[in-house]
């Protein structure tokens, strides 16, 4: 995802990174011209010809989420206070299978044969959709939620996957870190807040309509994903819109 990509970029650019949260964006006339940061010693200003917000979503507003701790919606608040528009904030995608600590269990596991069971040990997805475990995320997430409410729990049985430990070592390690052994028994799962389709209103070039202010990635709402993003399309959006926004920002200086 984004963190490994950022690490690669920073190595190539050899750019300094200030570990300081932004408090607000700064204006100059009718355009954005930098940001006010909270760093060592208090507040300090960083002046810039353009500001590109790439702060992620707001999954941490939910009790169970796959998002990192920084995903608190601050970028959207910064943009809104600067006069940018927000849209589609109600469209939050819930990943259907997360472990109790929010660790994501990939759809690829169900694609390889993992089965969803309710607390009675019954496979239930065929009752909700002809595609069963391979139904779209929103369908599976709603089914998991309903079965948890109805029976008291939902479990993912990973044992049908051949060579599970070799195919999905991260999933096995995350489960074992919680004291679970997916090679011996199904593991408890639940829907978790995963991705915000809504955010700062932008065009396909990341421009917010405020001169000098751009946004890319989950913080932005380009409209590309509709109400239910397809898996992995967010990475493509971040790469394409991030690149286009950088070029447009240079033109906008």
PLM region spans:
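An anion/pyrophosphate-binding glycine-rich loop and adjacent beta-alpha core
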Residues: 78, 84-187, 248-250
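Catalytic phosphate/nucleotide-handling subdomain of diverse soluble enzymes
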Residues: 208-253
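Glycine-rich loop(s) and the adjacent beta-strand/alpha-helix scaffold that form part
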Residues: 50-103, 233-243
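Feature captures the FAD/FMN-dependent oxidoreductase FAD-binding
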Residues: 1-47
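Core beta-strand elements of the Rossmann-like FAD/NAD(P) dinucleotide-binding domain
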Residues: 41-50, 208-212
């Amino acid at each position: 995802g984004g963190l490994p990509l950022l690490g690669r970029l920073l190595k190539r650019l050899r750019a300094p990174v200030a570990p300081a949260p932004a408090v607000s964006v700064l204006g100059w006339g009718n355009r954005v011209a930098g940001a006010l940061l909270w760093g060592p010693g208090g507040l300090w200003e960083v002046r810039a010809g353009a500001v590109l917000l790439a702060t992620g979503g707001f999954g941490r507003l939910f009790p169970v989420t796959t998002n990192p701790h920084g995903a608190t919606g601050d970028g959207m608040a910064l943009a809104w206070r600067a006069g940018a528009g927000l849209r589609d904030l109600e469209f939050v995608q819930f990943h259907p299978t997360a472990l109790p600590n929010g660790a994501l269990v990939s759809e690829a596991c169900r694609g390889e044969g993992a089965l969803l069971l309710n607390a009675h040990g019954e496979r239930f997805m065929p009752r909700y959709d002809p595609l069963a475990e391979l139904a779209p995320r929103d369908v599976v997430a709603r089914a998991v939620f309903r079965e948890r409410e109805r029976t008291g729990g939902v479990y993912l049985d990973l044992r049908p996957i051949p060579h599970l430990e070799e195919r999905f070592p991260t999933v096995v390690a995350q489960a074992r870190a919680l004291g679970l052994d997916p090679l011996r028994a199904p593991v408890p799962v639940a829907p978790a807040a995963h991705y915000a389709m809504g955010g700062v209103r932008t065009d396909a070039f990341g421009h917010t309509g405020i001169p000098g202010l751009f946004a890319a990635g989950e913080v932005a709402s380009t409209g590309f994903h509709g109400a239910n993003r397809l898996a992995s399309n967010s990475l493509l959006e971040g790469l394409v819109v991030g690149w286009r926004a950088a070029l447009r920002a240079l033109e906008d200086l």
